[in-house]
Amino acid sequence: FLPSYLNYICGRRKRVVVTATGNEANARHHFQGRIIGEMEHEDAEITVEENTKGFFVELLASAPELYAVTIISPSGEQIPRILVRRGASEQFNFIFEGTTITVDYRIDTKETASRFIRPTPGLWTIRIFPQLTVTGNYHLWLPLRELTDGNNFFLRSNPEITLTSPSAARQVITVGGYQASNTSIYADSGRDYTITGEIKPDFVAPAVDVDGP
C-alpha cells in the first residue's frame, strides 16, 4: 500500500514527503454509513451515467466489523446476499441489464471491492447487511474523477474523509487548498480525519485564483 511505503520513506534520515489532499471533497464519491440497533440493512445508492464502461466501489470497515452486501440494478434485478469469506471472489451477471459485477473480499483489511462492467445507466443500490458490528461504521468510495469515464456519484454522499490515498499516510506532510482571492475554503479540497483517525491536512496553501506575474 502506498501510505505504508511513504511512511517508510519518511522514517529515513533526510527524507520528507509532501503531498496534496486531492480534489474529491465535492465529487460525491464518498458514502459514510452506520448500522445500529435493530437496523437490518442500509442502502448506498449510486447514480450511473450513460455510456459508462465500468467502475469499481470499495467498502472499508475497521476490525472486527464484518458486512455482507447485495446489489440491486435499476430494473430491480438483485443478486443473492454475498457473505464474507476470506479471499473470496465472485462474479455475477445481470441478465436484463447486460452488466457483470465482480465482488472481492479481503478480510485482512476488512475491505470489499465491487467492479461493475458495462453498467446500465440509472440508480444502482448496494445493500449492506451487518454480520459483526461494534460501532456499525463503514465507508464506501468511488474512484477519483480522473479514473472514471462517467459522472457517477452517491445519491447520499459525505464530503468528509475524502483524502486521496497518499495524503492519508501518517508521516507525510499533507497540504490542502484554499481560494487565494478571498482566503475562503476551496470546496473541492479533500479534508477531515483519515480512516485511522489522524487529522489532515496539516496546513492549507493557495490553490484557486492564485495571482501570477
Briefly describe each language-model feature range.
Residues F1-P213:
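Loop-rich non-cytosolic ectodomains and luminal regions
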